[in-house]
């Protein structure tokens, strides 16, 4: 399986747009592809759930109900700050483990979208 990490210089620089386009491109080329957004901040609360627009866009592009996110944070700041504030020890090995879950392994290609900009320490 091949994986690509999608990052950018800042938040709102077009990572989700590019991820969505790549999912559509690879699907058109008959390549089984899944987009993942393991960590997201700036979420909206809906009852007991958090919703993140980027996660929703990628899930729609995936045409799948697989959970592509494991860490959602309400505050619109760098996820490592929010995680530390909440006592969550979010480490890169945890994110890598999430991206290697069995349900993602049947795909030929994983597109993993980062959170925030290039220098976010996750």
PLM ranges: what are they?
Residues 10:
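Conserved glycine-rich cofactor-binding loop
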Residues 95, 99-103, 107-122:
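Switch II (G3) loop of P-loop NTPases
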Residues 6-7:
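Hydrophobic anchor at the beta1->P-loop junction of P-loop NTPases
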Residues 1-2, 106:
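Extreme N-terminus of proteins, especially the signal/transit-peptide cleavage junction
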Residues 3, 17-89, 93, 98-102:
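N-terminal phosphate/diphosphate-binding loop that engages ATP/GTP or pyrophosphate donors
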Residues 13-14:
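Conserved glycine(s) of the Walker
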